[in-house]
């Protein structure tokens, strides 16, 4: 699950990114609204061609590959992917600043490293690794494979042969076909959204503040501490993961199965598994997200599943395995889906209402009122004028965007039905015709609320295409069609985020668009290769193993539900699902209507949903990370503000990168020499 980019609340959708800790405004030497450092003055900005450099592309490829491995690991274990944009911007700065420092010491002439180049590298790297989770490798595409087909069990919609096993050719071709068109759909409206409407795009603004802060004297001083912190915890995390590997030579072995709170709690997945990836993720996420995941684990594994399991033989047959969708696992999956859909439904209507209201207000005003005065701050006014001029000069012909979008529509309408015979060419045409309208609504809403609704549009499309295609073709058509719509809508919103970052860092839109295309092209190759490496090396999709990949089965069951309706649900599951849908909807409403001092204690239904399938161990890991940040902020808040992202990135990257050599060892049939297992005393 990759919770979408958001600043205030986490989780309107299940595949997106988790909210992060952002630097407190009082600790930054910048105004977040303008992202302008006091030390920055009007400057000569390089042309867009000079902003896209060979060293930058190489750095983006390396960062994109590293984060693709990390994101893929998270997507195939819990599916809860944290927002890594700030971490990627930090890595881009550290890589290029380190490179230029080495050249300086060697006496080699080099071009200066600017914030514009930093922004381009971050954009390119993020575009690369976004394909790893946005492309559906841990959800919809995984839901197409034979193992997930078998786990879904026998049902009229889950017809024999309704699966497509992973392969590099069709996967790379499919994500390439659906990833580029979204970048073109809203280019003609970029000035309207960023300059005329002055949409904030909070995540894009936060990234710009960070990048601008790097390129100051104080930022350079802080960067040295961040480099040391990152390298220290990267090394610690990598060595610890390497050490743990020696003790995992069998089933249910190693520190990842350490019964921290006793064997009884361990059986209910309550233990600390020493995963530094999720400790780092917990440091990036807000305290509320982490506590919400723990509450979800307690509610599900501590209360619900033990109670429902006692109904074996009455609510569901006693002679089928618990992993069957007709057994306990069916309740786990559909109650999780109910929480996701309840939270997503509320946020869909919320963002739709906010968007319509804001557009109506803007259309009723004169255009001149859209330009806000700077309160007499002449320097700020000059900065804004320079930003607007740079952003306007880097134009991209509207006719070229329209022509490119039309050409990609035709290509996709030809290619995708060849990959999936269940997807008709007119399904693709309908998706491409509706995508610009949905993309504008989503991009506008994201600019106001920082909530990316692409995953909700994708789920709606999944149900529509599944029902439209009918029983024999519905599952495949729903999974492929939902991925298509989601990616088209998400790409345009992500590009607007990057344009906002570029506007505030005085980066040319042309260089950002080029970076997006380069990064997307790299991601279309890197993501399938990374996925296939993991898929062949590990037992992906095993409900009782480490690599649970829960969202593959969730999305397949959504498609089955779209074809068959509620008849597919186990006994009493519909009533329970309706209750949890209402629970999620009411809690989401409460977060918006209650006073701030009370609303901040209302748990997030989306974050609560994840442990329903994957267990509570990762929630404990994330709470450990949250506790570390809490203590650090109490001891030295100023240091914690700029060191937490570096330390968290080091923990995530070290543990995540170890997955790459461990998968190579697994493919080479080299097994760990020791199995450390815990059993009750005699």
Swiss-Prot record:
This is Iron-phytosiderophore transporter yellow stripe 1. Disruption phenotype: Plants display leaves with yellow stripes. Iron-phytosiderophore transport is increased at low pH and inhibited by the proton uncoupler CCCP. The gene is YS1. The chain crosses the membrane at residues 56-76, 79-99, 124-144, 167-187, 236-256, 288-308, 334-354, 396-416, 428-448, 460-480, 514-534, 549-569, 574-594, 612-632, 640-660. Belongs to the YSL (TC 2.A.67.2) family. One of its GO terms (cellular component) is plasma membrane. Pfam families: OPT. Induction: Induced upon iron deficiency, but no effect of copper or zinc starvation. The lineage of its organism: Eukaryota, Viridiplantae, Streptophyta, Embryophyta, Tracheophyta. GO terms for molecular function: iron-nicotianamine transmembrane transporter activity; oligopeptide transmembrane transporter activity.
């Amino acid at each position: 699950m990759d919770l979408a980019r958001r600043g205030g609340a986490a989780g309107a959708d299940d595949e997106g990114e988790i909210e992060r800790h952002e630097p407190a405004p009082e600790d930054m030497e910048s105004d977040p609204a303008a992202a302008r450092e006091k030390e920055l003055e009007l400057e000569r900005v390089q042309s867009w061609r000079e902003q896209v450099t060979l060293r930058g592309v190489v750095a983006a490829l390396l960062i994109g590959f590293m984060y693709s491995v990390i994101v893929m690991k998270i997507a195939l274990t819990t599916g809860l992917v944290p927002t890594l944009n700030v971490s990627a911007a930090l890595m881009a700065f550290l890589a290029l600043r380190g490179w230029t420092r080495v050249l300086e010491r060697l006496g080699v002439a080099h071009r200066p490293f600017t914030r514009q180049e930093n922004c381009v590298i971050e954009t390119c790297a993020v575009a690369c690794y976004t394909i790893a989770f946005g492309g559906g490798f841990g959800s919809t595409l995984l839901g197409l494979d034979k193992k997930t087909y078998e786990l879904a069990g026998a049902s009229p919609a889950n017809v024999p042969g309704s699966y497509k096993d992973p392969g590099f050719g069709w996967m790379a071709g499919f994500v390439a076909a659906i990833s580029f068109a979204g970048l073109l759909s809203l280019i003609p409206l970029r000035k309207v959204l960023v300059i005329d409407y002055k949409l904030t795009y909070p995540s894009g603004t936060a990234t710009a503040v960070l990048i601008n802060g790097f390129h100051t004297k104080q930022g350079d001083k802080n960067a040295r501490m961040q480099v040391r912190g990152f390298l220290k915890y990267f090394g610690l995390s990598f060595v610890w993961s390497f050490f743990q590997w020696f003790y995992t030579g069998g089933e249910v072995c190693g520190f990842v199965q350490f019964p921290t709170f006793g064997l009884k709690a361990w059986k209910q997945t309550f233990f600390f598994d020493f995963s530094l990836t999720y400790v780092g993720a917990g440091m990036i996420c807000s305290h509320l997200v982490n506590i919400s995941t723990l509450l979800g684990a307690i509610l599900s594994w501590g209360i619900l599943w033990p109670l429902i399991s006692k109904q074996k033989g009455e609510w569901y047959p006693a002679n089928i395995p618990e992993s069957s969708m007709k057994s306990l696992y069916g309740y786990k999956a559909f109650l999780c889906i109910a929480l996701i859909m309840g939270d997503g439904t509320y946020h869909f209507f919320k963002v739709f209402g906010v968007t319509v209201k804001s557009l109506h207000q803007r259309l009723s005003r004169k255009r001149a009122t859209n330009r806000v005065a700077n309160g007499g701050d002449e320097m700020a006014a000059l900065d804004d004028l320079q930003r607007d001029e740079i952003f306007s000069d880097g134009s991209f012909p509207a006719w070229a965007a329209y022509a490119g979008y039309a050409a990609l529509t035709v290509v996709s309408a030809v290619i995708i039905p060849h990959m999936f015979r269940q997807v008709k060419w007119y399904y693709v045409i309908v998706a491409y015709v509706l995508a610009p309208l949905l993309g504008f609504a989503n991009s506008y809403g994201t600019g106001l609320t920082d909530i990316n609704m692409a995953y909700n549009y994708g789920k709606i499309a999944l149900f529509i295409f599944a029902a439209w295609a009918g029983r024999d073709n519905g599952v495949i058509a729903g999974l492929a069609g939902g991925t298509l719509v989601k990616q088209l809508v998400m790409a345009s919103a992500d590009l607007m985020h990057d344009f906002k970052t570029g506007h505030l860092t005085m980066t040319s839109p042309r260089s950002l668009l080029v970076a997006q295309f380069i990064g997307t092209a790299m991601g279309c190759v890197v993501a399938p290769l990374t996925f296939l490496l993991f898929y062949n090396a590990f037992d992906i999709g095993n409900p009782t193993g480490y690599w649970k990949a829960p969202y593959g089965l969730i999305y397949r069951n959504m498609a089955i539900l779209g074809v068959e309706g509620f008849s597919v649900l186990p006994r009493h599951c519909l009533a329970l699902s309706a209750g949890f849908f209402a629970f999620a909807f009411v809690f989401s409403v409460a977060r918006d209507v209650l006073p701030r001092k009370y609303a901040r204690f209302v748990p997030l239904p989306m974050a609560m949903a994840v442990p329903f399938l994957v267990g509570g161990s990762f929630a404990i890991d994330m709470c450990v990370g949250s506790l570390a940040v809490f203590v650090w902020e109490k001891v030295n808040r100023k240091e914690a503000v700029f060191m937490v992202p570096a330390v968290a990135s080091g923990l995530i990257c070290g543990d995540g990168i170890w997955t790459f050599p461990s998968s190579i060892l697994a493919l080479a049939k080299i097994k760990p020499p020791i199995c450390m297992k815990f059993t009750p005393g005699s």
